[in-house]
Design a protein with these regions (language model features):
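N-terminal cap/lid segment of alpha/beta-hydrolase-fold proteins
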Residues: 1-25
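Short glycine/proline-enriched coil/turn segments at helix->beta-strand junctions
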Residues: 25-26, 53-57, 102-104
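Short beta-strand element of the alpha/beta-hydrolase
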Residues: 26-35
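Conserved alpha/beta-hydrolase
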Residues: 49-76
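A short, mixed-charge helix-start or loop-turn motif at secondary-structure junctions
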Residues: 34, 75-82
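Short amphipathic alpha-helical segments
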Residues: 20, 44-45, 72
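The serine-hydrolase catalytic nucleophile loop
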Residues: 37-49
């Protein structure tokens, strides 16, 4: 079963993350980053994460300005989405990877 957590990502920005714990001995840690206009709970992402967690620790997350807020299934943050940039997404990834390096799963 996955568990959710949040990481601050700057002023009025949050990374909403899900951890899928490995179901045995972890071979590795996999971070799944959705593409443009995607989000972690959309389409196949939850199913892929669950399947990979049979042998790996898996983290999925929403970029802070992807348009998905507290309602994890609907596009509700249009103003943030309008301000999204590749630089912002790289910064989000740095924040997540830094957190994971300091808090091993």
């Amino acid at each position: 079963m996955n568990s959710n957590f949040e990481l601050p990502a700057g002023e009025d920005a949050v990374l909403r993350c899900s951890r899928y714990p490995v179901q045995g001995k972890a071979k590795s840690l996999i971070v799944i980053a959705h593409g443009y206009k995607g989000f972690k709970d959309w389409g196949l992402f939850p199913y892929v994460a669950a399947a990979l967690s049979r042998e790996h620790e898996v983290i999925t997350f929403n970029f802070s300005h992807a348009g998905i807020g507290e309602d994890l299934l609907n596009f509700t943050e249009l103003e943030k989405f309008a301000r999204n940039t590749y630089h912002r997404e790289l910064k989000d990834m740095e924040i997540l990877l830094s957190y994971l390096s300091q808090h091993p799963t």
